[in-house]
A protein has these predicted regions:
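Short secondary-structure boundary/capping segments
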Residues: 1, 103-114, 239-247, 282-297
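Second-shell loop/turn segments in exported
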Residues: 1, 15-18, 61-66, 190-197, ...
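Short, structured active-site-proximal loop/turn typified by the sulfatase FGly-forming signature C/S-X-P-X-R
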Residues: 1-29, 34-38, 87-90
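Stable alpha-helical elements in mature extracytoplasmic
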Residues: 2, 24-28, 71-75, 203, ...
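Generic, well-ordered alpha-helical scaffold segments in large soluble proteins
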Residues: 8, 78, 82, 206-214, ...
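A structural signal for short, well-ordered beta-strand segments and their strand-loop junctions
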Residues: 14, 87-93, 226, 276-278
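His/Asp/Glu-rich, glycine-adjacent segments
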Residues: 35-221, 229-237
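Metal-dependent active-site segment of extracytoplasmic phospho-/sulfohydrolases and closely related
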Residues: 252-294
C-alpha cells in the first residue's frame, strides 16, 4: 500500500507545519482549507473564550456536531460551490475529524461511540442514507472487532521492542512478555474499534461502499472522498511509538491501503483519480524511551 504510493507518486519528505500546536483538528483544518489557524479559526478541539471566560467546544451546537467555528472554506465546500453536481463525502471515526475535514457541506459520517454505528448530524442531514442505515442494522462493524489482538508477523520480524496488550505470534500466552500490562482497558466495542487496527479497516471499508453506492468518479464531474484514519494516533498515544502495537498497526494498515487502492483503481479509469496521503502531525519518542534514545545526544 505505502510502496504503491511512494514509488508511483511524488513524496514530499521535507514538508512541515509552521505553527504550534499541531493537534488533529487544527492541522486537519489547515490541510482541508489551505489556511493557517489564524485564518481558518480552529485552534483546538476546545478553548476558553477570554471575553466570556467560557469553554468553547469546536463542533458543539444546536444541530449536533458541525463546523460552527471553521471560518475558511474547505476543499469540499469549494468543490460543491463551483460544481454543484459533484459529490463530497467525508468519513472518519471521530466526529471532530469528520466535521473539520468536511467543513460546512457535503455528506459527512463518523462512528457513534455508544453503538459503533455510522452516523451524521442534523447539521449535515436529517439521517444517514439507507445503505448506511442497513449496515448499522446488520451490525456490520462488529465483524471487524476481535477480542484478541495478535501480531500479524512472527515476533522476530518486529523492530520495536515494547508490548503491552498485543499477543505475540510464535510465543505461548504464558510467556512473560506477552502477559501485557493492562495499560489500556478495552471495555467497549467503540474502544476495540478505535484502539486496534480494526478502526482503519472499518473506515476504509465504508469508503469503498461510498465509492460503489455513489458511483464516485464515474463521470466527468469531479468528486471528492475524504478519509480520516484516527486509529494510528489513538494507538500511538495509548501504547507509545516504540511499541509493537504501533508497528503491527502500520503493517496491517499497509495491507488495508493496498486493498483500498486496488479497489479504487478498479472502479475509476486510470489517470482520472488523484490519491493524496498525508498526516495532521508527527510524533515524538515516548517520555520514558530511556537508553534507546541516548545515542542521539
Amino acid at each position: 500500500g505505502f510502496r504503491r504510493l511512494t514509488e508511483g507518486g511524488t513524496v514530499y519528505a521535507d514538508s512541515r507545519y509552521d505553527y504550534l500546536q499541531t493537534t488533529t483538528p487544527v492541522s486537519l483544518a489547515t490541510l482541508t482549507t489551505g489556511a493557517m489557524p489564524s485564518t481558518h479559526g480552529v485552534i483546538g478541539s476546545r478553548w476558553v473564550d477570554y471575553t466570556t471566560n467560557r469553554t468553547v467546544e469546536l463542533t458543539a451546537g444546536r444541530k449536533g456536531p458541525g463546523a460552527y467555528h471553521l471560518i475558511a472554506p474547505t476543499l469540499a465546500e469549494t468543490l460543491l460551490r463551483h460544481a454543484p453536481d459533484s459529490r463530497a463525502v467525508t468519513i472518519a471515526p471521530e466526529a471532530v475529524s469528520a466535521v473539520v475535514t468536511a467543513g460546512h457541506g457535503g455528506e459527512v459520517f463518523w462512528l457513534d461511540s455508544a453503538r459503533c454505528d455510522w452516523v451524521t448530524s442534523p447539521y449535515y442531514a436529517a439521517e444517514v442514507p439507507e445503505w448506511i442505515a442497513r449496515s448499522n442494522r446488520e451490525r456490520y462493524n462488529l465483524s471487524y472487532i476481535s477480542g484478541e489482538w495478535r501480531t500479524l508477523l512472527e515476533r522476530g520480524r518486529y523492530l520495536n521492542t515494547r508490548n503491552y496488550d498485543i499477543a505475540l505470534s510464535g510465543k505461548s500466552k504464558k510467556d512473560k512478555d506477552q502477559s501485557g500490562s493492562g495499560r489500556l482497558k478495552l471495555r467497549s466495542d467503540f474502544e476495540r474499534m478505535l484502539y486496534t487496527p480494526a478502526g482503519n479497516t472499518a473506515v476504509l471499508g465504508l469508503a469503498k461502499q461510498a465509492i460503489a453506492q455513489y458511483r464516485l468518479g464515474e463521470d466527468k464531474i469531479p468528486d471528492l472522498l475524504n478519509v480520516c484514519l484516527d486509529s494510528p494516533r489513538r494507538i500511538s498515544e495509548a501504547y507509545g511509538p516504540e511499541s509493537i502495537e504501533v508497528e503491527d498497526m502500520y503493517y496491517r494498515l499497509d495491507r488495508d491501503l493496498a486493498d483500498f487502492l486496488t479497489f479504487v483503481f478498479a472502479q475509476v479509469k486510470d489517470g482520472s483519480v488523484t490519491v493524496v496521503l498525508t498526516s495532521d502531525h508527527g510524533t515524538s519518542p515516548a517520555f520514558d524511551a530511556g537508553a534507546e534514545e541516548a545515542d542521539r545526544f
